């Protein structure tokens, strides 16, 4: 069903073009996979992965083309807000990567409180030059408490307090069945110990980090401020403080400073698109690895308003790698997280987010699977 409104024709043409592009990409990629699959991997596995990548690429192109469709500015509506998530790789999440937040600041006296629970399951192993080794086998559970308040003249400020637990978790069997059901590769998860915790990093034959017992506590606290530049455009700055214990990967041991811009526009009366770009200055971390001075992140978020109280969402977050000169898979490439789910309005003040996460495009750079449930309450003055 097409969204109603005067811009339905334009959106229909863009959507039709997207599906044609997606089909051509799949045909082209599958032809390539027939050669690659015969020499390296089973052709069915390679073609399946390339189909997914063709779809994701097409969605990104669709979001870009949407900029040229006649649109109107979005009114502030919390059901259109992005998912609050970043790359949950335990060696990356310790840094202060800004999250994709709303492009609208709260009005004077308006406040919003959130409580979220997320689980991310990791299973990655890699060896390089026989002296570099990394094992990321475990789960990260995070209880996030956040609060922000509007101060007038387009200003708002807030705080984020994470409570983190690193453990063996409980999702391994479920994820193995999930991958079997959809014919997805296990990556060795089904051959390893179930619900075990093993975080280990060796560089040059020297152990730099090891965690095999459960660790929990307060993570790095984030303070942020936002300024509305215009309708649908918001500038935010934030600082991450070293309040988490780096020995348990609850924090980085350093102070990071980030700057981000969030942008939102209506595609139609039911479709909304938003984007985010950010840069973060990293301080020296506890692992003692050679780090990049700056990390960049991009976010793209697409919303479909099914009903006045329900919206479905698709979001893709990318980040540049934070470590230099480390050829191990989880560190060597940019990270990507594809999130899909929705938001339901419970009352005039309350709403609930539920979404799932997969690692795309580089499977080893982000958790294999995750989900988040977040409750939010917005109080008017």
PLM feature segments, named:
Residues 58-66:
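Bacterial N-terminal signal peptides
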Residues 76-283, 293-381:
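Transmembrane beta-barrel domains of Gram-negative outer membranes and organellar outer membranes
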Residues 1-52:
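N-terminal secretory signal peptides that target proteins for export/translocation
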Residues 5-6, 44-46, 72, 92, ...:
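Intrinsically disordered, low-complexity segments enriched in proline/serine/threonine
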Residues 286-290:
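Residues at flexible loop/coil and secondary-structure boundary positions
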